[in-house]
Regions:
Chain A
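Rossmann-fold NAD(P)-dependent oxidoreductase module
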Residues: 23, 27, 133, 180
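A short helix-to-beta-strand connector/capping loop
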Residues: 54-61, 135-138, 187
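Rossmann-like NAD(P)-binding element
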Residues: 55-102, 106-114
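Rossmann-fold NAD(P)-binding glycine/threonine-rich loop
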Residues: 97, 105-156
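Active-site-lining helix/loop region of Rossmann-like oxidoreductase modules
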Residues: 150, 161-227
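Short beta->alpha connector loops
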Residues: 80-83, 146-147, 170-171
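NAD(P)+-binding Rossmann beta1-loop-alpha1 motif at the extreme N-terminus of oxidoreductases
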Residues: 2-51
């Protein structure tokens, strides 16, 4: 059940047609929301395939980045980190104005092979770059520290005893994202502070990648235990 | 109880007289080992204070970095990241040759205020710099992802249901460090691979620092949950 700070059904934009985008899109449809999947072109093959599979819902739509951002009351950035600023520029600052913009991206640089490095320093983050470039959007960094299946079904693992991290400058926007996370099944959500905390969750990615290797599965997550 | 791959009593060098160094030194004394705390000068005030408090054991010693490294069969680097290479140079490559060198340091740069940034990129780590500079030492990165009290008494928190991470190029050295961790009470130890994985655990520090703020205590740690 979606709690009070989120309307029971809302319009969501998902920018990006990869696994993260379609996984979140499907979860939102399952919860009764309307979803537009946005990509660079209207005839993106992955978007059309997703739309075909989701047509029965009557609430699945496809369009350009700009179409989707105009459609959504809340916007998810699910593009690759290296494409994020450009994709959001195509979405259009005007279409993002005043909206909660959930940034799931990571500043991964795959150009030098595996494991990828980060294209940000520890004094910078993609979350901050997004907030700076789209100053009137209410950016919340979230969903960037676990694999796609766990993002939307956290209770699959350890009965949900693991943690989601959020950060952002807008307290009301973070409350909405917390509500959304709870509607996905998240029990443990840690608010790390303002958008500069994106440095922290993005810099966790090198450890996430090594743990992926050590665990031999992407179905793992971390639980913060405290006294 | 220390298991088969570690002798029941051994000689340890601790380089660095801060909280991490003295906390580990006291734990090693409590387990019956001999310990020399090394610092830049023989008359370091913190080292002498520690020695006074530990004299009853008959197994506590102080000396220069070089004295300690010569004394220890296993060497702990517990100096600040910014001082690590210089401290190890003073310890002397010859005194480190063939020895297990446990590197607990983090590449934190406090010069621009709090929170500290990292002075390494995601394609580099202090662990690798140490291994490269002291090629005949058997470097194992460990103990750099939790607060000092938890390093030596992990069962204080959540009955020890949280994780220590190690990495290094020498399998036998990592086995010795795993034995040592178990003798300290660690139940969950994840081997992340070769020394390049130090990039991962060192890059976790920005998240550790934000979690410290969010948890309002340093008595927290992370547990990796997996399917």
């Amino acid at each position: 059940m979606v709690d009070a700070t989120l309307a029971s059904t809302m319009k969501f934009a998902i920018l990006g047609t990869g696994t993260v985008g379609t996984t979140i899109a499907n979860k939102l449809l399952a919860l009764g929301h309307d979803v537009m999947l946005g990509s660079r072109t209207k005839d993106n093959a992955k978007a059309l395939e997703w739309h075909k599979g989701s047509a029965a819902s009557g609430r699945a739509h496809v369009g350009t980045f700009a179409d989707a951002a105009a459609f959504g009351e809340v916007v998810f950035n699910c593009t690759l980190g290296s494409a994020t600023i450009e994709a959001l520029s195509l979405a259009g600052a005007g279409n993002l104005e005043g909206k909660v913009l959930i940034d799931t991206s990571n500043p991964l640089d795959f150009s030098k092979g595996m494991p990828p490095s980060l294209f940000t320093s520890s004094e910078d983050s993609l979350g901050e770059r997004v907030q700076k470039a789209f100053a009137s959007a209410r950016v919340v960094k979230a969903f960037n520290t676990m694999s796609a299946p766990l993002m939307v079904e956290p209770q699959q693992l350890a009965d949900g005893q693991h943690d989601a991290f959020i950060c952002g400058n807008d307290a009301a926007a973070k409350e909405q994202v917390q509500s959304l996370l709870r509607s996905f099944g998240w029990k443990h959500i840690i608010d790390l502070g303002d958008i500069t905390a994106a440095r922290a969750t993005e810099h966790y990615l090198p450890l996430w990648l090594r743990l992926w290797g050590a665990c031999k599965t992407h179905m793992f997550s971390v639980h913060v235990v405290r006294s």
